[in-house]
Amino acid sequence: MIFDVKAPILGFETIHKMRLQKIDEIFLRLNSTEENSVVSFTLVNPFALRKYEFEVPTPLKILLELEGAKSVLVANIMVVQTPIELSTVNYLAPLIFNLDKQLMGQVVLDSNKYPHYHLRENILSHTHE
């Protein structure tokens, strides 16, 4: 599914369309669709790994048309390492997808409001919760 990027991923502000592909129940792949840009992210379903909740800021709710949306997906960027146990997840800057309208964006959470989320957390750090 191809999404219009309404709130850019930090560092990738020139990318306006991205393709999301489900790998399995936990992992997804996000790729740029622009010919002059080869950007690819591995995403992870945070709810499969830990308790995870946050408030979406009102401006992002408006940009992504989340009010009344029936299908919303939250995913986090993962840095894959070998072995997989060394991989890290960015819980402080989740991606939000409005599947109904094919809109997406990244929200950067306030680390003071969410001190239990970090930019680089080991993928296994919450598996025993």
From Swiss-Prot:
Q: Which GO terms describe its biological process?
A: bacterial-type flagellum assembly; regulation of translation
Query: Quick one: a GO cellular component term?
Result: cytoplasm
Which compartment or compartments is the protein found in?
Answer: Cytoplasm
Q: Which UniProt keywords apply?
A: Bacterial flagellum biogenesis, Chaperone, Cytoplasm, Translation regulation
Instruction: Please name the Pfam families in this protein's record.
Output: FliW (PF02623)
Name where it mostly resides: cytoplasm
Lineage, top-rank taxon, reads Bacteria
Q: Which family does it belong to?
A: Belongs to the FliW family.
Q: What does this protein do?
A: Acts as an anti-CsrA protein, binds CsrA and prevents it from repressing translation of its target genes, one of which is flagellin. Binds to flagellin and participates in the assembly of the flagellum.
Which HAMAP family does the entry mention? FliW (MF_01185)
Q: What name is this protein filed under? A: Flagellar assembly factor FliW 2
The species is Helicobacter pylori (strain ATCC 700392 / 26695) (Campylobacter pylori)
Which lineage? Answer: Bacteria, Pseudomonadati, Campylobacterota, Epsilonproteobacteria, Campylobacterales
